[in-house]
A protein has these predicted regions:
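Glycoside hydrolase catalytic-domain context in secreted enzymes
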Residues: 1-793, 797-813, 821-824
């Protein structure tokens, strides 16, 4: 920090203290409670603007859960981490800061830095990695980037929120060493290296104490030990105890206006249950945030002028390609690798799979944003091959992974019409799909919870196929469904036994009717929902969906058509995918199988075309039982809005696939280190201790399908020399291929007979290098002191473990290229 920066920081602190001195108890308590779903109250008398928050982490949705104000949609966080490039993450963060400033958002509710403890985790796609060091490095880059743009970040979910099942109440039981060395480590690294302006405490308990009330982890570890000076906000509806939360270090209870703070907090102070100094501490943290983002009069913002504009579409395309991981690339008939395709030589490409046409570009839940455009694989390849002489593209659906109803989307033009009890329209707006998700004040203009008696999702549907179309609903309450002007179902959906209040919405859809329709002939559709009285609820919300599923042709017939298309083509590209019923916030996965008959499709196509390339459009690992039967496998994660364009760039060789696996890819579900995420009597034991991810595979001598850190490019690298000290590792390598490329040099430490219980090896550091054909490059990589330390619970501190270490310069955890011996005193 420069002298000028320090001076500005002092001015901000003076402004914070001056503002705090002017507030009475009731106003202070009100400031700590959300005024609505996404903001804190303004206090004009001290020059405080309303602080506005918004979900991330791959875009900035803003304060409305609608497509009215589109947002850029970047690749999923796992895809971003796959680039193994903190500086690239920083650039992504700067773009999101630009989006936030455009939308009037002060604080982004991201990044998510929980770990890939189990591939079953419903929000696996929203987290970076199974490795704490990689997570901390990428997360630090992201936080630095967002805050470079003058927008605050909220690192979440602190801590132990690594699965969705019973997430509101589960007790994550984690021993001291894994808690410190694994699960807290990314948060600690980000606090140290990026100085985040906010953190979000999770719903769950850790070792018996609710995280929003966890005095030890928040007050003692996060603040006193690590030096965190930002604001601490609850996950939405996680704050449940006025005294417990304020004494546990929770600054802000969200969402409002009905929270455990506000009047309840002021009363607790007056009753002597809470010292006013605890309230002052929380208010000080909120005012400091306001000062940093420019929302407090008299305090200079950290960033006063908006940075230079960034081309969002171009960066989204670059990010996608940099995160694509080529895990297999075998030689085909002419002896060359399957990828990149030789489009200049012409030939026919058969593109197969439902996800090639209707791409899944992001995961479900609070990470959802509404991009202005989406480039599917079909769009991207069609555009890229249009000007390539002799090249042609065919498309066949092959097999559809969506065997369940989903929110009405393709072919639907819908709007929501809100009416009062007399039937008069009080508000209306367009819908991007059949999903209505209005939370807090996120309502169409003119509508209110007090006046709305019904909401009608209405519009037209232009079928893309002949046959029997299924329609359904999701949500709780009374519905009337009409198709073609006729009521086809009317009834009430009651609440089940779901512990998670969002689970009914995110849970299983209900089919209500089947209607035979004709391709290309529009039909009117309508779903009317009777609005219940929600005015007394702590969180006012309306959530329901009009669902649709197109005609389901026999899978064997679809696969047969795909086989014929593949047989006639020079190259077959099969896009396989998960669905929103497989990967989303609100629930965990049951297994790692691809939905539907997609495995059968791949095998059938590979049997007739030896040049079969499989593109895996999934946010987290899936089983690939056919992986040795195809020429190439490319993992694209949830690639964001420009995914199809980036895919064409990579397949045709215009761009090298830059990704390396941020998580181990199991050969089968049974091999995963953690295969159970359902709590027992409310407790989820982290019995694996330190051994998650690649650490567990190595400890159990299990070979995964693809190891942590694995990824192929379009060139080759020779590792030539390695020098290691306790502070740095120096590696020299040469690009021995015929084209420029990027390599990620991964440094692992392996202790030699030290007698300490810990993994056999772990990632200590990494660096990316670039070189042209025949060019050599040398990189010096700093080794963090923490790489040699373990947590000593008795001493309540970190202990440096001396002895002999093998230092490994590796292409992946399973591919060590050079080793050196290091004796550590």
């Amino acid at each position: 920090m420069t002298d000028a920066d320090q001076a500005r920081e002092q001015i901000r602190e003076y402004a914070v203290e001056a503002a705090l001195d002017k507030l009475d108890l009731d106003t202070k308590a009100r400031l700590l409670s959300g005024q609505d779903m996404w903001s804190l109250p303004a206090i004009p008398e001290i020059g405080l603007k309303s602080l506005v928050m918004s979900d991330g982490p791959i875009g900035v949705r803003g304060v409305r859960w609608t497509a009215d104000d589109p947002s850029i949609a970047l690749p999923s966080p796992t895809g971003l981490a796959a680039a193994w490039d903190p500086e690239l993450a920083r650039r992504a963060g700067r773009l999101l800061a630009q989006e936030a400033r455009r939308k009037g958002v002060h604080v982004l509710l991201a990044p998510t830095v929980n770990l890939h403890r189990s591939p079953l985790g419903g929000r696996h796609f929203e987290c970076y990695s199974e490795d704490p060091y990689l997570t901390g490095a990428v997360g630090s880059g992201y936080v630095n980037g967002v805050q470079d743009g003058g927008v605050g970040t909220t690192v979440k979910h602190f801590v132990g929120n690594d699965a969705e099942t019973e997430r509101f109440t589960v007790d994550s039981v984690i021993a001291p060493r894994p808690l410190r060395e694994v699960y807290l480590a990314p948060f600690e690294a980000i606090v140290a290296n990026a100085h985040p302006w906010g953190i979000m405490t999770a719903y769950n308990r850790v070792n018996g104490t609710t995280m929003t009330e966890h005095q030890y982890l928040v007050n003692e570890v996060l603040r006193a030990e690590w030096g965190f000076d930002g604001y601490n906000v609850s996950d939405w509806m996680a704050a449940r105890s006025t005294t417990g939360d304020i004494l546990g270090g929770l600054d802000v209870a969200m969402p409002g206006p009905q929270t455990v703070y506000g009047p309840a907090l002021a009363e607790a102070v007056r009753a002597g249950e809470v010292p006013e100094s605890a309230v002052d501490t929380a208010v000080r943290n909120v005012l400091r945030l306001a000062a940093r983002v420019g929302a407090l009069e008299g305090a200079p913002a950290v960033v006063e002028e908006a940075p230079a504009p960034i081309d969002g579409q171009a960066l989204a395309r670059e990010l996608a390609a940099r995160g694509f991981v080529l895990v297999r690339n075998e030689a085909v008939a002419d002896g060359s690798a399957a990828l990149p395709l030789d489009a200049a030589a012409g030939g026919t490409v058969a593109l197969l799979g439902a996800a090639a046409r209707d791409a899944r570009v992001l995961g479900g839940g609070s990470a959802v944003v509404f991009p202005e455009r989406i480039v599917s694989p079909l769009d991207g390849l069609t555009s890229a091959l249009r000007d390539r002489s002799g090249a042609s593209l065919t498309y066949t659906i092959g097999a559809d992974p969506s065997e369940e109803l989903t929110p009405a989307d393709k072919g639907f033009e819908l709007r929501a019409v809100c009416r009062d009890a007399s039937g008069a329209v009080v508000g209306e707006g367009t819908l991007p799909s059949g999903q209505v998700q209005w939370i807090g004040d996120d309502l169409p203009a003119g509508a209110s919870y007090e006046t709305m008696a019904s909401i009608e999702v209405t519009g037209t549907f232009l079928p893309r196929e002949n046959g029997e179309h299924a329609f359904g609903t999701r949500g709780l309450g009374a519905f009337t469904l009409a198709v073609g002007g006729e009521t086809v179902w009317e009834g009430v959906q009651e609440m089940g036994n779901e512990a998670d209040p969002f689970e009914a919405f995110f849970g299983a859809p209900s089919e209500r009717a089947r209607v035979t329709l004709t391709e290309g002939e529009p039909v009117e559709v309508s779903l009317t929902f009777q609005v219940p009285d929600v005015t007394a609820l702590p969180l006012k919300a309306i959530m329901f969906s009009l669902l649709h599923l197109g005609p389901q042709r026999e899978a064997d017939e679809l696969i047969a058509e795909a086989v014929e298309a593949a047989r006639a083509a020079d190259t077959a590209i099969v896009v396989v995918a998960t669905t929103e019923r497989v990967e989303s916030e609100g629930f965990d996965r049951k297994d790692l199988a691809l939905p539907g008959r997609q495995d059968d499709l791949v095998r059938a196509v590979a049997a007739v075309n030896p040049h079969t390339v499989v593109v895996v459009n999934a946010g987290s690992p899936v089983e690939l039982p056919w992986r040795d039967e195809v020429a190439a496998v490319l993992l694209t994660w949830f690639p964001g809005q420009e995914g199809g364009a980036a895919l064409a760039d990579v397949l045709l060789g215009d761009t090298e696939p830059g990704g390396r696996l941020p998580t181990t890819w199991p050969a089968r579900f049974a091999d995963a280190p953690v295969t159970e995420v359902v709590p027992t009597e409310g407790r989820l034991e982290y019995g694996e201790g330190l051994f998650i991810g690649y650490r567990a595979y190595e400890a159990r001598s299990i070979r995964p399908a693809f190891p942590f850190g694995h990824g192929l490019g379009y060139t080759d690298w020779a590792y030539e020399s390695l020098e290691a000290t306790a502070e740095t590792v120096r590696v020299r390598l040469t690009n021995t291929g015929a084209r420029p490329g990027r390599e990620v040099v991964q440094v692992y430490l392996a202790p030699v007979d030290d007698g300490v219980e810990r993994p056999a090896s772990w990632l200590a550091a990494f660096a990316g290098v670039e070189a042209g054909p025949g060019e050599s490059v040398e990189t010096e990589i700093a080794l963090p002191a923490r790489a040699f330390e373990i947590w000593d619970e008795e001493a309540r501190g970190w202990q440096r473990i001396g002895g002999t270490y093998e230092v490994r310069a590796s292409h992946s955890h399973g591919d060590t290229r050079l080793t050196a011996t290091l004796d550590l005193a």
